[in-house]
């Protein structure tokens, strides 16, 4: 009888094939798998004596016989670069996992660009789970402030108290980086934003402080003044697309004029700026994606992050039976970014994504985010605060996650029960 973990890996591999090609079906047996490719049936057995990678390799070779391959080969995990980093023989790694030349080059370039010039200790993450409307593609846990009133003062009070409680458990006064994410952190009122940043500024010494503004319609000069005053070094302004019609379609209310205005305003400060794009949004075609990338490159933010749409159950699109298109423009998009002086510095994969592709952050030389490098490679512990925040405790090769309550009322009620 196959182990549960083995069954999971087999399902993941077949899902990736089915996502790019019709005419594929399969049935998991007690000690193997029976599957069909365009009506040609195959049965592989003896899996109970094999490792997960050996099983996947046997299956993959059958697809290769039919001229069917995957860009990432049999690498089905979220963080393929962690396996790459551990491999002594990189070429043998490429062959073992059937990784394409293009993705192998991406791993090589990313790995070279993510080294820190200091020994990391730990970082902090603060979650602000509020948004000014919910985008149709979004599957993150957040709360729509246009549908319900929330007590931001009480929430920020609780986050600050949680940080104080954690400080009694361990010294967290000198993190490498602090990341304030969401949700849309800039969706809360400025007075509470200032209170949180003032507390951070007075109690922590850090190398990098990121504030994920996100939507242009939540940003204005008063907010940027506050961020600048309290030591924010990096902000995110995320258009997701540079197509006006798509912005309306995905319920993202800020238009391009507002985006350009906010971006120019932010350029008047000493912030590094990241901008996100999503490949696979409803109604967009090749020219839309290429045009969006070109527009961002012309704006010259310090970093550009390319996401491939992941269709999760929580998203409105998924609930409306939206189907992902297989659009692989990664080679063309990455080439344009390379030519413009951007290099990849972190990457990860998700399930249920457009063309089984990856999410990659590119930055200009020397402008990579410390937090992203640490987080994506699980280099150190990350102590997380706020509703829905997930802490990662890392001790050598051991990683343990601790999840805060997602429900805001439950979070506020239970945060004071921490063992101090």
Annotated model-derived regions:
Residues 127, 236, 304-307, 372-373, ...:
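Beta-strand scaffold of nucleotide-dependent catalytic cores
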Residues 314, 318, 322-385:
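A C-terminal junction/extension of Radical SAM enzymes
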Residues 142-333:
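Conserved non-cysteine loop/helix-boundary elements of the Radical SAM core domain that shape
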Residues 84, 127-129, 276:
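Conserved acidic functional residues
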Residues 33-35, 126, 235-237:
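Short beta-strand motif preference
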Residues 121-156:
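Canonical Radical SAM [4Fe-4S] cluster-binding loop centered on the CxxxCxxC motif
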Residues 66-81, 86-125, 172:
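N-terminal [4Fe-4S]-dependent radical SAM core
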Residues 1-77, 81, 86-88, 365-420:
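Radical SAM enzyme core and accessory elements
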